[in-house]
Amino acid sequence: MPRKPGITTKAREKAKPAQAVAKPAPEVAKLGYFVGKWATQGTILPGPWGSGGDFSWTETTEWMSGNFFVVGHWDFKMPAELGGDGEELFVMGYDTNRNVYSFDAFSSQGLHQVSKGTLSGDLWTWTSESIQNGKPVQQKMTMEILSPLSYNLKFELSTDGATWMTFMEGKAVKKQ
């Protein structure tokens, strides 16, 4: 004969220890700097990638439920020789096992970028690797926080890990 739920079953359920709710690591809170609406403008320098030109993007970034990750969306404008205009979805987080920040981005141009980041004082440094013309290229994005409402950025490329070429430089300004 099956047991009917009753006081005994309910008492057992209440006696179960409550599951600990996971809390974000303290480092995760630092990603909150990027939450909001941003406008970024800058210049792509001439180089092996082409003649360069102006770039811009608008960005909306928010906390994902649980406050472990920041999710964002960019609408960008680039010179046509570099792929032109598009959009990108990205997720930022912190890997407590590796003690490193993470950045995963997916663009409307079919690109997927995976970066690792560090924060030292007011300087964020993001590194990644891509394949260009069949060869590995190291990438480095530095973001120097100027104030709660702005930061400078610089994106560099290297084929040997020692010599870096500046691809683009710009400034981001928070709108909200």
Predicted regions and their residues:
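Hydrophobic small-molecule pocket/channel-lining residues, especially in calycin-type beta-barrels
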Residues: P2-Q176
